[in-house]
Regions:
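Flexible, processing/modification-adjacent segments and terminal tails
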Residues: 104-157
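Bacterial Sec signal peptide processing site at the extreme N-terminus
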Residues: 21-44
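Post-signal-peptide N-terminal segment of Sec-exported extracytoplasmic proteins
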Residues: 44-83, 88
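Sec-dependent bacterial lipoprotein signal peptides
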Residues: 1-29
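Gly/Pro-enriched, hydrophobic low-complexity segments
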Residues: 139-199
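Extended lipid/amphipathic-ligand handling interfaces
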Residues: 67-70, 91-93, 166-170, 197
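An acidic-aromatic
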Residues: 75-124
Length: 199
């Protein structure tokens, strides 16, 4: 029974780690460089509300979850649930700091996402980037490359040791419905995102 509980905790921890690594990227401890132009700045900060599913693998741990991510005006809120709908955590962040809250009422607060993941998971996970990567853009502050498909849409983005591969449901759809993120440095990780709703 104890081994089963440990395995279950391991899966939830791996899934939460992946979600934390991928979520809430607007609040960072880095000072970003200025965007190339006003249009890029607007796109980088544009609000969105997405819902979908993810699966994550890091080392021998893996897990899956559903998520709803709301991003607006430098504030983010991510609700994580098991595939059967059981709440895993709510993650929130803004300029004042970041928080993780579990269903049993436990709350952990930190100044940055790196600090929060270090305290809750035992390892600092870089969380800058995903809000830009979702839109097929390299995040400001570090070099990145974007390869485009025949329709001019992002096909592969590489930045910060991550490779993000975009898949589209058809040739006419401008936004990717599936993203595969691979990290090959240090502890390799792979995260697959399926976006069911994007507003």
């Amino acid at each position: 029974m104890r081994a089963g509980r440990c395995a279950s905790r391991s899966v939830i921890r791996a899934c939460a780690a992946a979600c934390l690594a991928l979520a809430l990227c607007a609040c960072t401890s880095l000072t970003p460089r200025e965007p190339a132009n006003v249009a890029d700045a607007a796109a980088a900060g544009a609000p969105f509300d997405i819902a979908g599913r993810l699966s994550a693998r890091r080392g021998t741990d893996g897990g899956s979850a559903s998520f709803v991510w709301r991003h607006e005006g430098g504030a983010d809120e991510v609700d994580l649930a098991t595939p059967l709908g059981q709440t895993l955590a709510r993650l929130t962040g803004d300029a004042a700091g970041v928080r993780a809250q579990w269903p049993d009422g436990r709350t952990v607060e930190a100044r940055t996402w790196d600090e929060l993941t270090e305290r809750t998971l035992g390892v600092a996970i870089p969380v800058q980037g995903l809000s830009a990567w979702l839109r097929g853009r390299a995040r400001a502050g570090t070099p990145g490359t974007v390869e485009r498909d025949a329709q001019g849409r992002p096909a592969v983005l590489r930045q910060d040791g991550w490779e993000i591969v975009y898949a589209y449901p058809d040739d006419a759809t401008p936004k990717a419905s599936r993203l595969t993120l691979r990290y090959e440095q240090g502890q390799p990780a792979e995260v697959r995102l399926i976006i069911d709703r994007w507003q």
